[in-house]
């Protein structure tokens, strides 16, 4: 009798868990693999009673799925977020009840420059199709966005960020993918924030890549872990040490993107380890463009004081980094091409750009152009606390063009990064 009772209690507990998680599958997202010309990673979660652990995929023109292929995911029980203090959409404090099966699948052998659809499920039950596009086109474009701090009690934050992506889509209806520069959640330890965010349409339509922001790394009560962003995604496992799946690199076409985690670079030892890895990646992976991404700003937008620029500029000069992207400061800052601390004609040097916030809530106000580093900084932009902006990035063999757009699609700033490598 006791055994029967214990079994019933266990079944009830699992059923209650399944009821508290979203309907399976959840937190579905397409992520880059190391070479996005022929390989894409898919990440999702299912409750412990679900068998939706496969992904099927085919070219977007094959709407009947007649030529679909299927991949069984690698799975494990994920408890990363379970029991962490959080907030309900109604603003009530509770502990995340998030024990689920994490699924990761790599779709390989893909055709370059091709639109694909994919869905999650098993047997005859499959989710609605989602989309991604492989790289390989001579010309491509992306939406760059940052700092919308998803927080379910204040859904207008994500609404503003997603509306900004729609604005970029209107500016360029053929964008290929989305890159974020961190702080896309208020607390990365709140799995409910990730699952709600990834239900939004832009996560259905594009491959997403991104870096770990300080908010993505934290919990409501100031816990810290890089596992939060790692387990909400499936990034390439080509980083270093404990940063596998958090720090990573990938190709989109002939551009090499290198993704860093500022939270492990606060001390000199962590910075040295990250820089040794970046040097190795650049030396072993040739590309027309080298683009390094991190969350913390290169310069402080309100006064122009150097932040991360001084820690990285010598290495970027040495390695020939073309573009350095960041977020965090909530103020747009863009420099001239810089080499050896001085502006150049663009034939050498790195352009440093940090994105504005996009949640219509957490922007900053500045009165004048920065008083420091005026010889380096070429543009700043803000809308005060209610700032919303994003960047359209266009690439071809001759140059990268970055265009800052406001929420209405107006061009606020534009810069060109010349190709310096064949």
What are these regions (language model features)?
Residues 100, 125-181, 187:
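An acidic-aromatic substrate-binding cleft motif
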Residues 138-141, 173-178, 203-209, 245, ...:
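Loop/turn elements at helix/coil->beta-strand transitions in domains of secreted/extracellular proteins
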Residues 101, 106, 115-131, 192-279, ...:
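Extended active-site neighborhood of metal-dependent phosphoesterases/phosphodiesterases
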Residues 156, 264, 270, 285-324, ...:
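Active-site-proximal segments of metal-dependent phosphoesterases and phosphodiesterases across multiple
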Residues 158-220, 318:
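Core catalytic region of metal-dependent phosphoesterases/phosphodiesterases
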Residues 18-150, 394-422:
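Acidic, histidine-bearing metal-coordination/catalytic regions of metal-dependent phosphoesterases
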Residues 144-146, 177-183, 187, 208-214, ...:
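Active-site neighborhood of phospho(di)ester-bond hydrolases with catalytic His/Asp-centered motifs
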């Amino acid at each position: 009798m006791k055994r029967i009772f214990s079994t019933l209690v266990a079944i009830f507990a699992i059923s209650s868990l399944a009821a508290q998680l979203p309907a399976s599958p959840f937190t579905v997202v397409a992520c880059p693999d190391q070479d996005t010309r022929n390989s894409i990673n898919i990440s999702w979660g299912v409750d412990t009673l679900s068998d939706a652990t496969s992904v099927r995929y085919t070219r977007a023109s094959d709407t009947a799925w007649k030529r679909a292929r299927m991949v069984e995911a690698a799975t494990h029980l994920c408890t990363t977020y379970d029991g962490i203090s959080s907030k309900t959409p109604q603003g009530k404090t509770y502990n995340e009840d998030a024990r689920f099966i994490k699924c990761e699948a790599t779709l390989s052998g893909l055709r370059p420059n091709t639109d694909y659809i994919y869905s999650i499920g098993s047997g005859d039950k499959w989710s609605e199709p989602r989309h991604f596009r492989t790289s390989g086109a001579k010309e491509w474009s992306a939406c760059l966005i940052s700092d919308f701090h998803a927080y379910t009690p204040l859904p207008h934050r994500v609404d503003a960020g997603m509306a900004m992506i729609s604005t970029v889509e209107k500016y360029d209806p053929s964008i290929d993918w989305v890159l974020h520069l961190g702080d896309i959640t208020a607390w990365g330890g709140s799995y409910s924030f990730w699952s709600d965010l990834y239900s939004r349409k832009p996560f259905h339509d594009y491959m997403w890549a991104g870096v770990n922001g300080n908010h993505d790394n934290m919990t409501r009560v100031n816990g810290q872990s890089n596992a939060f962003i790692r387990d909400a995604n499936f990034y390439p496992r080509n980083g270093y040490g404990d940063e596998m799946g958090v720090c990573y690199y990938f190709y989109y076409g002939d551009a090499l993107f290198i993704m860093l985690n500022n939270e492990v670079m606060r001390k000199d030892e962590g910075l040295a380890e990250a820089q040794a890895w970046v040097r190795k990646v650049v030396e072993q992976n040739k590309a027309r463009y080298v683009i390094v991404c991190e969350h913390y700003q290169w310069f402080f937008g309100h006064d122009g004081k150097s932040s991360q620029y001084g820690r990285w500029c010598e290495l970027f000069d040495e390695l020939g980094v073309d573009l350095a992207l960041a977020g965090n400061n909530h103020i747009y800052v863009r420099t001239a091409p810089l080499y050896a601390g001085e502006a150049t004609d663009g034939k050498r040097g790195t352009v440093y750009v940090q994105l504005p916030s996009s949640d219509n809530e957490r922007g900053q106000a500045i009165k004048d152009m920065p008083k420091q580093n005026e010889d380096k900084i070429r543009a700043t932009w803000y809308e005060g606390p209610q700032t919303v902006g994003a960047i359209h990035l266009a690439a071809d063999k001759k140059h990268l063009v970055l265009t800052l757009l406001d929420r209405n699609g107006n061009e606020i700033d534009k810069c060109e990064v010349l190709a310096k490598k064949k």
